[in-house]
Curated annotation (Swiss-Prot):
Gene3D superfamilies: Phosphoenolpyruvate-binding domains. It comes from Salmonella paratyphi C (strain RKS4594). This is 5-keto-4-deoxy-D-glucarate aldolase. It catalyses: 5-dehydro-4-deoxy-D-glucarate = 2-hydroxy-3-oxopropanoate + pyruvate; 2-dehydro-3-deoxy-D-glucarate = 2-hydroxy-3-oxopropanoate + pyruvate. Mg(2+) binds at residues 153, 179.
Length: 256
């Protein structure tokens, strides 16, 4: 057994409420993802919702992270079993599921990652995740080593946060601050007091159910505040944001 895969160290860290500092990968490039993997982050989101990623771009990025201590987390474009199955088969063990609003939707996400009888994952005997059939106990280990993080980013999701957090198999609750702000009537202003109060409420309810909570916070002051509020896995920036800021600074240094 490949000990870098099983047990799932990121899943264990969430269960232990250990602080995990991460980064967002949106450039869909194996080179930039490899650089992120060398930086020392605990986890990396490879974004399949808002970034131009699919199976063919994600496989090279997973290859680029081989040997990295950073746990790859895929954000799928939608909570759909076939999409999730394909991400499982190419080698993802950690999932961020966007726009979860009910306990039923959370349970469906969990079921999509589990083989029967615990779930509905389709069975392939040879794929990248089981090293093309060379991992003898893959089926026995897989169900126990998948991480499910559900994203709350709507008023309905906030209303159902207790039921969602209590769902068996859900490892963490993640706040989508931009969509949440829009849902609360503050498009483009995640710093609005209403949004901040709601974020703190989501964190508190997740913690009450023993679940880790996380968020994307590219502004340092925001990230530190969320950590103080009890967030345990925080993405503190993105490859796109870092690249844009550094190149703009470089240009400004010589052009202004």
């Amino acid at each position: 057994m490949n000990n870098a895969i099983f047990p799932n160290k990121f899943k264990a860290a969430l269960a232990a409420q250990q602080v995990q500092i991460g980064c967002w990968s949106a450039l869909a490039s194996p080179i930039t993802t490899e650089v992120l993997g060398l930086a020392g982050f605990d986890w990396l989101v490879l974004d399949g919702e808002h970034a131009p990623n699919d199976v063919t771009t994600l496989i090279p990025q997973l290859m680029a992270l081989k040997g990295s201590a950073s746990a790859p987390v895929v954000r799928v474009p939608t909570n759909e079993p076939v999409i999730i199955k394909r991400m499982l088969d190419i080698g993802f063990y950690n999932f961020l599921i966007p726009f979860v609003e009910t306990q039923e939707e959370a349970a469906r996400a969990v079921a999509s990652t589990r083989y029967p009888p615990e779930g509905i994952r389709g069975v392939s005997v040879s794929h990248r995740a089981n090293m093309f059939g060379t991992v003898p106990d893959y089926f026995a280990q897989s169900n126990k080593n998948i991480t499910i993080i559900v994203q709350i980013e709507s008023q309905l999701g906030v209303d159902n946060v207790d039921a969602i957090a209590a769902t068996e198999g859900v490892d963490g609750i993640f706040v989508g601050p931009s969509d949440l702000a829009a849902a609360l009537g503050h498009l483009g202003n995640a710093s609005h007091p209403d949004v901040q109060q709601t974020i703190q409420h989501i964190f508190a309810r997740a913690k009450a159910h023993g679940k880790s909570c996380g968020i994307l916070a590219p502004v340092e002051a925001d990230a530190r505040r969320y950590l103080e509020w009890g967030a345990t896995f925080v993405a503190v920036g993105s490859d796109l944001g870092a690249f844009r800021a550094s190149t703009q600074k470089l240009a400004d240094t010589f052009k202004k």
